[in-house]
Structure formats: C-alpha cells, structure tokens
Amino acid sequence: MAYHTRVPDVLGMGLLLDNAAPWMGLAVPALLLLALASRSRTSLAVLLVPTLTWLFIFGPAIVPLSWSAPQPGAHTLALSSQNIKAGTGAAAQSALELAADGSDVIALQELDAGSAQRVTAALEEDYPHHFVVGTVGVWSKYPLSNSRSLELGLGWKRALSTQVDTEYGSLRLYVIHAASARPNDHVDRDEMLVQLASAVRSDPHENMVAVGDFNATSTDRAFKKISTILEEPNQDDGLLGFTWPRSPFAMMRLDHVLVRGLEVTSNTNVEAGLSDHFAVRAVLNLPGK
C-alpha cells in the first residue's frame, strides 16, 4: 500500500497497483473481523499498521474541503470539465446542463464529429468565446487569448492551452484528454503527462488551472509528474471524488482540477449529459487587478 509506486511496472502490475491503492483499505475491515474472531490482542495490534498506513497516505485527501476552504471573494469564476463520451450525441446536453449549473467556463473532452459545432450553437448567446482543438474544447463567458494547441509528444492534438481574461484578472487554462491507459499499453498517456508537466513548469503565468480527463488517478506514478507542480483541492464533502464509471458506481478519479496561484472555494463532481464520466466543477477566487 505504501510502496506501490516502487513496484516495477512489469506486465502492467505497476499500473494496476497504483490505481488499486485506495481500495486496499477495504482489507482492513475484513482483517478486523478475523482478529475479533480470533480474540487475539496481537492480531488487533498488528492491524493498526495497515490502518494507520492507509490513514497516513489517504487521510489528508478525504478531508472535506468545506472544513478549510477560503471564503468566496467578491469575484469568482466557476469552471466545469467533462469527458462527454464520444458517440452519445449528448455533447450539447452536457454543455447546457453545466451552463445551467452556473459555470463561467466549460471544458469538454472526447468531442466527435460535429459535436463542437452543436455545443457552440447551443452556448453562443452566453458563451461567445470558444477554442476547439481536435477532441477538446473550451467555451467561455470571458474573452480567450493566446490560445494554442498542444500535441504533448503525440502526432495528434488532444490538449490545448488558453488564457481566460476577466475584468478582475486572467488565468492560464490547460485542457487535456490524455491517451488511454491499459496494463500493457500506457506509453502515450505517460508521455502526454510528462510533456504537460514540462509545459506547465515553463509557463510563467502565476495563475493556472489544468483540467480534463487525465486517464490517471492521483495515485498513479505517471500522474505525479503533474501533481507535484500543481495542486489538486479536496472535494467539498470529502472522500476521493471518483469520476468514472458513472454507473453503477464510480471507482476511479480520472478527471481532475489542478491549480497554481488560485484559491479554490469549491470542488465537486456533478452529473451532466449521457457520459460515463462525472463532470468536475470548481469555483475559484479571481486574483483581482
């Protein structure tokens, strides 16, 4: 549990252990029942080791953000992101539901043919600014500038960066749809995360947000490349905020909101459209002039 990232990634074992790490805590109740059945004080004492280990590793991440979140400032920005699932035909539905939830900026991934145009048409009155690259796009109430596509080591474009310019300050936004990760095939995903971390590290903007489907959990060793330079806020109500699959129940957090230089007053998962991913939604205090 504590050293899963040190296990060599042979035959995909590293990837599997990394992503299963939070669930290893489920062994503790089973072990507790066995210890109680045996009436062994030694067994109960030994059980403290995995219990305390799990709490040490994951305890800080499950504390509700609402316990310590900064107060919303005079000017905030609500940002939502979702992998809308290609082939559902519900990209515009997702976008409209996220808009109705009060989002100022909406980032979507896994856009397929024609879906970006349908989203733009659905949102054009309230979100006149947009930038789309390949399968990812951003729609904003605020002007966008310095927008560019990002290949991130691949031969096709699944990421972008843009600057969101508000009256109360600007922020640099990165949107990514990382390549899929399977036990025997996650090289492209790993390379995209390395390249994204490099782009973020060299970006001089003080205020930054990276969102999207990273196809990596927070315990994935490849995700550490980016999570060590950007911060992921806890969930409003605590726990680990699993986003996939949406049904029958979520088991992994593949979709993230990562920030630098900005206060996050809220961070939640929301349902939208027909996707198999929950959307992620964060509210940020704008930096001011």
Language-model-detected regions and their locations in the chain:
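N-terminal, active-site-proximal structural segment of metallo-dependent hydrolase catalytic domains
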Residues: 1-121, 288
